[in-house]
Amino acid sequence: VARIIHNDLTLANASAWQWWTAVSLGEDVPIQLLPLEGSNGLSLQYDGEISTTKMLWTTANYSFFVRPGMRRISVKPTYKVSDLEAATSLMISSYTDGKEVVTVVINYLEDNQVITLNCDYAQKGKVYLTTIDKNLQYMGEQPLKKLQLPARSVATIVVEDN
């Protein structure tokens, strides 16, 4: 779902992105953020268990940090790839509100990647990571020059804007 959000915001220039169904009952719903399991369907108050999915956490890499009023800013990769190639490798987008810059990086590759984010006014950024075993986990402040991206991950990097 992170790739869909990225492409909607960067290629289609969507100004907002919404998820219509948060809680779903049953296994036949393929796009569940919060699936409800074990319920007889009569009452959410007395039975059933709500769990989270990776779709929820990858959506959170955007929704917790890219806030209303932010605007997308230009990201210039040092290499040239088509939109199709980017959708199957690395996707990067950045947003600002004048106080901070939020960058979301999707590593869709099967291998770990090391990238450099060039920022004139900051050397480090706060990194939040979603992987197969991490759910929007705060990874501390990381150097922007050698940012480690695990395979099949979504990272959000927050830098104070000066």
Task: State the predicted function of each range.
Residues 6-11, 93-95, 119-120, 146-149:
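A general structural signal for short secondary-structure junctions and capping/turn motifs
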